[in-house]
From Swiss-Prot:
Name of this chain's protein: dCTP deaminase
Sorted UniProt keywords: Hydrolase, Nucleotide metabolism, Nucleotide-binding
Pathway in which the depicted protein is active: Pyrimidine metabolism; dUMP biosynthesis; dUMP from dCTP (dUTP route): step 1/2
MF (Gene Ontology): dCTP deaminase activity; nucleotide binding
Function: Catalyzes the deamination of dCTP to dUTP.
Active site residues according to the UniProt entry: 137
Family the UniProt entry places it in: Belongs to the dCTP deaminase family.
Residues involved in dCTP binding: 111-116, 135-137, 156, 170, 180
Length: 188
């Protein structure tokens, strides 16, 4: 497997719709204000967080069960910022919609700006031929409330191309998160 460059990312986004909307360069300012950067980097793509958040609360549940997850465990927030309670987490989604090629596996890593503040971003790999908005999980590992900014960079996608096309893609096996839009809760 080889990691793909900015040239490849740009070509795949512009000619094949791999990332929509797509930013061909790095954006570091909104007007006069400095922001957490997003867009194409040397060997990756920095994604933005949309303004839709689901903030975890334990008001309605006594246990978290991925097989029987209670949607009431979240409070929905639509805002330019999300305040995550201490030692809690929130879900969000990318602004960008992805269409992953059949020969590519995409890995998501959190941006150091957030990691250095104790805010961890977790996303599972984007498998070959998966498409949709990426659901992002932000963990606040600190004893203080933590802030996430919508429409700014939150994580970096790395694209790895295999030497051989997979026999069965995510689309082929009818993956449960195929085509997801918005923030998507756990499914079994």
């Amino acid at each position: 497997m080889s990691i793909k460059s900015d040239r490849w990312i740009r070509r795949m986004a512009e000619q094949h719709g791999m990332i929509e909307p797509f930013e061909p360069g790095q954006v570091r300012h909104a007007g006069e204000e400095r922001i957490v950067s997003y867009g194409t980097s040397s060997y990756g793509y920095d994604v933005r967080c949309a303004d839709e958040f689901k903030i975890f609360t334990n008001i309605n549940s006594s246990i978290v069960d991925p097989k029987a997850f209670d949607a009431r465990s979240f409070v929905d927030v639509k805002s330019d910022v999300c305040i995550i309670p201490p030692n809690s987490f929130a879900l969000a989604r990318t602004v960008e919609y992805f269409r992953i090629p059949r020969s590519v596996l995409t890995i998501c890593l959190g941006k150091s700006t957030y990691a250095r503040c104790g805010i961890i971003v977790n996303v599972t790999p984007l498998e070959p031929e998966w498409e949709g908005h990426v659901t992002l999980e932000f963990s606040n590992t600190t004893p203080l409330p933590a802030k996430i900014y919508a429409n700014e960079g939150v994580a970096q996608m790395l694209f790895l191309e295999s030497d051989e096309v997979c026999e069965t893609s995510y689309k082929d096996r009818g993956g449960k998160y195929q085509g997801q839009v918005g923030v998507t809760l756990p499914k079994t």
